Amino acid sequence: MEKRKIILDCDSGHDDAIAIMMAAKHPAIDLLGITIVAGNQTLDKTLINGLNVCQKLEINVPVYAGMPQPIMRQQIVADNIHGETGLDGPVFEPLTRQAESTHAVKYIIDTLMASDGDITLVPVGPLSNIAVAMRMQPAILPKIREIVLMGGAYGTGNFTPSAEFNIFADPEAARVVFTSGVPLVMMGLDLTNQTVCTPDVIARMERAGGPAGELFSDIMNFTLKTQFENYGLAGGPVHDATCIGYLINPDGIKTQEMYVEVDVNSGPCYGRTVCDELGVLGKPANTKVGITIDTDWFWGLVEECVRGYIKTH
């Protein structure tokens, strides 16, 4: 089986932690590095969260700090969902794990330029790191095999009626990525909201056990509370983990090719991913957009990854 080489670019909230856990353990994925961006919380907090997850699960992958601010807009955070730390819920041991000294954007550029065009970028937070890398060194564009991202929606947003948080947090960066010409796969809210993690799923992962089962439980029990308080949902969707699911087995997720444009005009639609689902604009599709996911398959995959952290010796 071919291992997909990926760089996981994240803002280290609750669903990001599940994505890290899956990407680092599944045999179909070769996780080269983790790059951190500001998003769910400020960069200092998202960096600590990423390092904490790696330390707890003994994930020996280099971690790089990236963009602390969006390209243009005023910074926003999602503390209503992810809490004051950006990863409220779990209690971690004192942190000894350290980030690399290289900036995430430089790491992305250098790694892609040295590659054979076989690396996939997996941004599951705001697209600031990816966009700045593209602008700093446009020669990386043909080197990117694919970008599989979590963000946007062809229906309703979750941070404004129009916009999903990751895109709204840096719409200008998203505009750069969506106009780059690189093959794009978008896991938007329409798809990711199908992965609502209800108490029975949490109990299933607790039964699976090990450090990842414990972390999953602590993370998703907190998310259960904030998702109900903010959106009335019966559980928290694990948005970002769907990107890892897609990379492991694209057949588990139905996609549709669409032309997608990011609205960067100020107003009520700022940050919206305008998806031409019906093809009325007549423009060539630039994105595969996630439509539906086989949730039985997906939770089975998550459990498989959780069990991978159980030590047998």
From Swiss-Prot:
Catalytic activity as recorded in UniProt: a pyrimidine ribonucleoside + H2O = a pyrimidine nucleobase + D-ribose
Hydrolase in keyword set: yes
Active site: D11
Necessary cofactors: Ca(2+)
UniProt-recorded Gene Ontology molecular function terms: calcium ion binding; purine nucleosidase activity; ribosylpyrimidine nucleosidase activity
Example GO BP: purine nucleoside catabolic process
Keywords: Calcium, Glycosidase, Hydrolase, Metal-binding
Protein EC: 3.2.2.8
UniProt superkingdom: Bacteria
Residues annotated as binding substrate: Q227, H239
Binding site for Ca(2+): D11, D16, V124, D240
Cellular component annotations (GO), alphabetically ordered: cytosol
Cofactor comment text: Binds 1 Ca(2+) ion per monomer.
HAMAP family hit by this protein: Pyrim_hydro_RihB (MF_01433)
Oligomeric form and interacting partners: Homotetramer.
Record PANTHER family: INOSINE-URIDINE PREFERRING NUCLEOSIDE HYDROLASE, URIDINE NUCLEOSIDASE
Function: Hydrolyzes cytidine or uridine to ribose and cytosine or uracil, respectively. Has a clear preference for cytidine over uridine. Strictly specific for ribonucleosides.
Family from the record: Belongs to the IUNH family. RihB subfamily.
Name under which the protein is recorded: Pyrimidine-specific ribonucleoside hydrolase RihB
Organism: Escherichia coli (strain SE11)
Gene transcribed to yield this protein: rihB
